[in-house]
Amino acid sequence: MLEGAKSIGAGAATIASAGAAIGIGNVFSSLIHSVARNPSLAKQSFGYAILGFALTEAIALFAPMMAFLILFVF
């Protein structure tokens, strides 16, 4: 019974990877739109996009960590 609950919890924790993928797509979609509207701010926009990518990717890295914690620690 407990092993099944652990597997369900680990699976639910990895759903965050899909959300992170959507978030990264939104970050770079916004970058393309902003550069198309104002090309003179391309370098500044790219810096902000990389920051947004890094923060979004951090969530994607926390998801498998939580899944492994659920499976092997608790």
UniProtKB/Swiss-Prot annotation:
Residue ranges of the TM segments? 8-28, 50-70
- Which InterPro entries does the record match to this protein? ATP_synth_F0_csu, ATP_synth_F0_csu_DDCD_BS, ATP_synth_F0_csu_sf, ATPase_proteolipid_c-like_dom, F/V-ATP_Csub_sf
**Domain of life from the UniProt record:** Eukaryota
Feature type site, description Reversibly protonated during proton transport: 57
Key words of the record: ATP-binding, CF(0), Hydrogen ion transport, Ion transport, Lipid-binding, Membrane, Mitochondrion, Nucleotide-binding, Transmembrane, Transmembrane helix, Transport
Q: In which broad location class does this protein mainly occur, judging by the first location in its UniProt entry?
A: mitochondrion
- Membrane topology classification: Multi-pass membrane protein
Q: Where does it live in the cell?
A: Mitochondrion membrane
Kindly name one Pfam family recorded for this protein: ATP-synt_C
UniProt GO MF annotations: ATP binding; lipid binding; proton transmembrane transporter activity
GO cellular component terms? mitochondrial membrane; proton-transporting ATP synthase complex; proton-transporting two-sector ATPase complex, proton-transporting domain
GO BP annotations, alphabetical order = proton motive force-driven ATP synthesis
Assigned protein family: Belongs to the ATPase C chain family.
Reported function: This protein is one of the chains of the nonenzymatic membrane component (F0) of mitochondrial ATPase.
* Subunit organization: F-type ATPases have 2 components, CF(1) - the catalytic core - and CF(0) - the membrane proton channel. CF(1) has five subunits: alpha(3), beta(3), gamma(1), delta(1), epsilon(1). CF(0) has three main subunits: a, b and c.
Question: What's the protein here called?
Answer: ATP synthase subunit 9, mitochondrial
